[in-house]
């Protein structure tokens, strides 16, 4: 006599597959954004996450958008681990984000003219502190002197105005435009 056999095939949860990200590059002071994708034959809801052991970057995932924010003026490489999960099974990828350096503009700080209350017999001395985050040397900094609001080209790039060029009741000021030979800072 014939026998009937019935089998029931139960679905198996398949691991979601994270789409390849690959190594990525950005420039210093930029934010990296990437839309994460994955394949899931079971049509399960997927959850993305990302982490990094580097203290030089901030990593966040909102829905399927990965955002990496490097610290200001930082450049270098950081490994990032991205995972996708259906709540039970997980796939992951580790990629390297390389942050390329850019030349930052230098700054002139603590700009001052001494003495602050000069007499007609005093030379005027300009002082400032040159700073550059990369440590580039000062090259091509421009100094502009003004007397009573009028630029005096004969004293361009001079740190000292001799007392013979000043008179009582004149108003003097100076601007410093710092330069590292490539970029110039703000006045």
Q: What role is predicted for each listed range?
A:
Residues 109-119:
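Pro/Thr/Ser/Gly-rich low-complexity, intrinsically disordered linker/stalk tracts
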Residues 1-14, 22-104, 119-186:
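Acidic, turn/loop-rich segments in luminal/extracellular domains of secretory-pathway
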């Amino acid at each position: 006599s014939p026998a009937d056999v019935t089998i029931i095939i139960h679905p198996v949860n398949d691991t979601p597959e994270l789409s390849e990200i690959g190594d990525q590059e950005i420039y210093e002071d930029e934010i990296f954004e990437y839309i994460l994708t994955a394949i899931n034959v079971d049509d399960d809801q997927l959850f993305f996450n990302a982490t990094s052991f580097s203290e030089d970057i901030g990593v966040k995932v909102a829905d399927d958008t990965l955002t990496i924010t490097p610290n200001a003026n930082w450049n270098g490489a950081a490994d990032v681990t991205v995972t996708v999960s259906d709540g039970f099974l997980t796939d992951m990828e580790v990629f390297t984000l390389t942050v390329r350096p850019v030349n930052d503009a230098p700054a002139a700080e603590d700009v001052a003219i001494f003495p602050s209350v000069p007499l007609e017999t005093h030379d005027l001395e300009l002082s400032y502190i040159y700073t550059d985050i990369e440590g580039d040397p000062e090259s091509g900094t421009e100094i502009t002197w003004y007397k009573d609001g009028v630029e005096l080209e004969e004293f361009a790039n001079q740190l000292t105005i001799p007392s013979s060029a000043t008179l009582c009741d004149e108003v003097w000021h100076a601007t410093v435009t710092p330069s590292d030979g490539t970029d110039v800072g703000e006045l």
